[in-house]
Amino acid sequence: MMYEADATSNESARPAGCLRVLVVDDAPDVTELLALMMSHAGYEVAMAFSAAEAFDAARAGRFDAVISDIGMPGMNGYQLAEALRALPGYERTPLIAVTGFTHQEDRERARRAGFDDFLHKPINPSDLLDAVRKLCG
């Protein structure tokens, strides 16, 4: 099930080209923390707790960026990125991987799947916001 997180009044901190962000992680506490980081920065945030749920949300609505875990049961983050890249309107949407995977091979696989950036957990809020701003700006 997808949930919306309220954006705060810090809209001046976000770039005009990136308003709606989808956050995806199978760990609800991580999903909620990432969504909180983004909403405090002024973004409108939707949350999904699986890659399949995120793909359904992307088909149903438009997101300006997607922040996704990689290691999820069922459809994983790599598969989600590939599916999103094949979805009309998502060919150039910024996709950011947030993961506990730390090897260079993981980073390379993420790029091949369609991710634009790759951040290691635990996530530093400023690193996440910088990545979103860089890709959306």
PLM features: what roles do these ranges have?
Residues 31, 73, 91, 103, ...:
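The feature encodes the CheY-like receiver
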Residues 32-40:
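Charged docking surfaces used in two-component/phosphorelay signaling
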Residues 42-49, 57, 119:
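Short hydrophobic/Thr-rich beta-strand motif most characteristic of the beta2 strand and flanking loop
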Residues 62-67:
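Active-site beta3 strand of CheY-like receiver
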Residues 69, 99:
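Active-site residues of response regulator receiver
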Residues 72, 84:
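Receiver (REC) domain active-site loop signature in two-component systems and cognate sites
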Residues 123-132:
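C-terminal output helix
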